[in-house]
Amino acid sequence: DKVLYLYRLLPIPFRTICQMLYEHAHFDSYGVGENLITSASDPVFGGVYKLVAVKKPDGSYTPKMKCSDSASKAIIPGKKMPWRLYDENGQAQCDLIAMDGEVIEAGKPVTMVNLDSDAIERTITFTPTAVRPLLVPHIVGGKLAIELPSIAEKKAYIAKQLTEETWESELRLECPHKHYVNMTPAVAECRSRMYAELHGGKV
Protein backbone atom coordinates (compact mmCIF):
# COMPACT_ATOMS: atom_id res chain seq x y z
CA ASP A 1 0.00 0.00 0.00
CA LYS A 2 1.14 3.51 -0.76
CA VAL A 3 0.89 6.24 1.86
CA LEU A 4 0.27 9.85 0.89
CA TYR A 5 1.55 12.54 3.24
CA LEU A 6 0.17 16.08 3.12
CA TYR A 7 2.41 19.04 3.94
CA ARG A 8 1.38 22.68 4.33
CA LEU A 9 4.44 24.71 3.35
CA LEU A 10 5.47 28.37 3.14
CA PRO A 11 5.74 30.61 6.22
CA ILE A 12 2.66 30.17 8.41
CA PRO A 13 1.83 32.26 11.51
CA PHE A 14 1.02 30.15 14.56
CA ARG A 15 -2.48 31.63 14.69
CA THR A 16 -3.15 30.26 11.21
CA ILE A 17 -1.94 26.81 12.27
CA CYS A 18 -4.18 26.93 15.34
CA GLN A 19 -7.17 27.86 13.18
CA MET A 20 -6.41 25.07 10.68
CA LEU A 21 -6.15 22.52 13.49
CA TYR A 22 -9.41 23.80 14.98
CA GLU A 23 -11.05 23.27 11.59
CA HIS A 24 -9.61 19.71 11.46
CA ALA A 25 -7.29 20.33 8.52
CA HIS A 26 -5.77 17.01 7.46
CA PHE A 27 -2.10 17.92 7.16
CA ASP A 28 0.68 15.68 8.46
CA SER A 29 3.21 18.48 8.82
CA TYR A 30 3.44 22.27 8.68
CA GLY A 31 6.27 24.37 7.26
CA VAL A 32 6.50 27.24 9.70
CA GLY A 33 9.55 28.77 8.02
CA GLU A 34 11.00 32.07 9.21
CA ASN A 35 8.09 32.56 11.61
CA LEU A 36 9.85 29.97 13.77
CA ILE A 37 13.52 30.83 13.28
CA THR A 38 12.94 34.56 13.90
CA SER A 39 10.56 34.02 16.85
CA ALA A 40 8.07 36.28 15.09
CA SER A 41 5.75 36.79 18.07
CA ASP A 42 8.58 37.69 20.50
CA PRO A 43 11.74 38.43 18.50
CA VAL A 44 13.62 40.01 21.41
CA PHE A 45 14.51 38.41 24.74
CA GLY A 46 14.51 41.13 27.38
CA GLY A 47 17.17 39.97 29.80
CA VAL A 48 19.21 42.57 31.72
CA TYR A 49 21.81 42.04 34.45
CA LYS A 50 21.44 44.42 37.40
CA LEU A 51 23.49 44.76 40.56
CA VAL A 52 21.43 43.64 43.59
CA ALA A 53 24.10 43.04 46.26
CA VAL A 54 27.78 43.58 47.03
CA LYS A 55 29.82 40.98 48.90
CA LYS A 56 31.67 42.25 51.95
CA PRO A 57 35.03 40.93 53.27
CA ASP A 58 33.25 38.94 55.98
CA GLY A 59 31.25 37.04 53.34
CA SER A 60 27.93 38.76 53.97
CA TYR A 61 26.12 40.83 51.33
CA THR A 62 24.94 44.45 51.27
CA PRO A 63 21.66 44.85 49.31
CA LYS A 64 21.75 47.34 46.43
CA MET A 65 18.97 48.92 44.39
CA LYS A 66 19.04 50.92 41.16
CA CYS A 67 17.28 54.29 41.24
CA SER A 68 14.06 54.24 39.20
CA ASP A 69 11.24 56.75 38.89
CA SER A 70 8.76 53.91 38.40
CA ALA A 71 7.87 51.77 41.42
CA SER A 72 6.80 48.97 39.07
CA LYS A 73 10.36 48.80 37.72
CA ALA A 74 12.00 48.73 41.13
CA ILE A 75 14.33 45.72 41.28
CA ILE A 76 14.36 43.30 44.19
CA PRO A 77 17.59 43.95 46.15
CA GLY A 78 19.72 41.51 48.09
CA LYS A 79 21.14 38.00 47.64
CA LYS A 80 18.15 35.74 47.15
CA MET A 81 17.01 32.16 46.66
CA PRO A 82 13.96 31.36 44.52
CA TRP A 83 11.79 28.40 45.55
CA ARG A 84 9.00 26.45 43.86
CA LEU A 85 6.06 25.44 46.04
CA TYR A 86 3.91 22.37 45.34
CA ASP A 87 0.44 21.24 46.40
CA GLU A 88 -0.66 17.78 47.55
CA ASN A 89 -1.01 16.63 43.93
CA GLY A 90 2.59 17.45 43.10
CA GLN A 91 1.52 20.42 40.96
CA ALA A 92 3.60 23.58 41.20
CA GLN A 93 1.47 26.39 42.65
CA CYS A 94 3.87 29.32 42.52
CA ASP A 95 7.46 30.48 42.81
CA LEU A 96 8.68 32.32 45.88
CA ILE A 97 11.60 34.75 46.09
CA ALA A 98 13.24 34.48 49.51
CA MET A 99 16.35 36.02 51.00
CA ASP A 100 19.36 33.73 50.86
CA GLY A 101 19.34 31.84 54.15
CA GLU A 102 15.59 32.01 54.70
CA VAL A 103 14.22 28.54 55.45
CA ILE A 104 11.21 27.44 53.39
CA GLU A 105 9.88 24.08 54.57
CA ALA A 106 7.26 21.65 53.28
CA GLY A 107 4.26 21.20 55.55
CA LYS A 108 4.65 24.61 57.19
CA PRO A 109 2.56 27.71 56.34
CA VAL A 110 4.38 30.23 54.16
CA THR A 111 3.35 33.89 54.11
CA MET A 112 3.85 35.44 50.69
CA VAL A 113 3.58 38.98 49.33
CA ASN A 114 2.29 39.45 45.78
CA LEU A 115 4.74 41.25 43.49
CA ASP A 116 1.79 43.15 41.99
CA SER A 117 1.16 46.17 44.22
CA ASP A 118 -2.35 46.47 42.75
CA ALA A 119 -3.34 42.90 43.65
CA ILE A 120 -6.62 42.60 45.57
CA GLU A 121 -4.98 40.22 48.06
CA ARG A 122 -1.43 41.49 48.55
CA THR A 123 -0.54 38.96 51.26
CA ILE A 124 -1.48 35.28 51.11
CA THR A 125 -0.60 32.17 53.11
CA PHE A 126 -0.02 28.76 51.57
CA THR A 127 1.13 25.45 53.08
CA PRO A 128 3.17 23.55 50.48
CA THR A 129 3.47 19.78 50.61
CA ALA A 130 6.84 20.00 48.85
CA VAL A 131 9.36 22.74 48.07
CA ARG A 132 12.34 22.93 45.72
CA PRO A 133 15.15 25.51 45.52
CA LEU A 134 15.48 26.77 41.94
CA LEU A 135 18.94 28.32 42.08
CA VAL A 136 21.44 25.48 41.62
CA PRO A 137 25.14 26.37 41.18
CA HIS A 138 26.53 24.86 37.97
CA ILE A 139 29.98 26.47 38.10
CA VAL A 140 31.83 26.85 41.42
CA GLY A 141 35.34 28.27 41.56
CA GLY A 142 35.57 28.09 37.78
CA LYS A 143 34.82 24.35 37.73
CA LEU A 144 31.75 22.36 36.74
CA ALA A 145 29.84 21.50 39.92
CA ILE A 146 27.16 19.20 38.50
CA GLU A 147 27.01 16.11 36.33
CA LEU A 148 25.72 17.16 32.93
CA PRO A 149 22.43 15.41 32.06
CA SER A 150 22.02 13.26 28.96
CA ILE A 151 19.74 14.31 26.09
CA ALA A 152 17.11 11.82 27.31
CA GLU A 153 17.28 13.31 30.82
CA LYS A 154 16.91 16.82 29.40
CA LYS A 155 13.83 15.76 27.42
CA ALA A 156 12.29 14.13 30.49
CA TYR A 157 13.00 17.25 32.56
CA ILE A 158 11.34 19.56 30.02
CA ALA A 159 8.33 17.23 29.71
CA LYS A 160 7.92 17.29 33.50
CA GLN A 161 8.21 21.09 33.50
CA LEU A 162 5.35 21.35 31.02
CA THR A 163 3.05 18.87 32.77
CA GLU A 164 3.71 19.30 36.49
CA GLU A 165 5.47 22.66 36.84
CA THR A 166 3.26 24.72 34.55
CA TRP A 167 -0.50 25.25 34.43
CA GLU A 168 -2.28 24.51 31.15
CA SER A 169 -3.58 28.08 31.13
CA GLU A 170 0.02 29.35 31.08
CA LEU A 171 0.73 27.45 27.85
CA ARG A 172 -2.08 28.76 25.67
CA LEU A 173 -1.01 30.93 22.75
CA GLU A 174 -3.62 33.64 23.25
CA CYS A 175 -3.80 35.53 26.57
CA PRO A 176 -1.73 33.04 28.58
CA HIS A 177 -2.13 33.08 32.35
CA LYS A 178 0.75 34.62 34.31
CA HIS A 179 2.98 32.32 36.33
CA TYR A 180 2.64 33.32 39.98
CA VAL A 181 5.83 34.73 41.51
CA ASN A 182 5.66 36.02 45.09
CA MET A 183 8.18 37.20 47.68
CA THR A 184 8.65 36.60 51.37
CA PRO A 185 7.84 39.41 53.84
CA ALA A 186 11.59 39.86 54.43
CA VAL A 187 12.20 40.46 50.72
CA ALA A 188 9.19 42.78 50.47
CA GLU A 189 10.33 44.77 53.51
CA CYS A 190 13.87 45.18 52.16
CA ARG A 191 12.56 46.30 48.77
CA SER A 192 10.06 48.79 50.23
CA ARG A 193 12.58 50.20 52.72
CA MET A 194 15.30 50.74 50.14
CA TYR A 195 12.86 52.25 47.64
CA ALA A 196 11.58 54.65 50.31
CA GLU A 197 15.15 55.64 51.21
CA LEU A 198 15.94 56.37 47.55
CA HIS A 199 12.68 57.97 46.47
CA GLY A 200 10.69 58.76 49.59
CA GLY A 201 7.77 56.63 48.41
CA LYS A 202 6.30 53.14 48.74
CA VAL A 203 6.49 50.21 46.37
Language model: regions and residue ranges:
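Acidic, glycine-rich loop-and-beta core segments that form the ion-binding/anion-interacting portion
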Residues: 1-7, 16
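Gly/Ser/Thr/Ala-enriched C-terminal appendages of enzymes
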Residues: 12-203
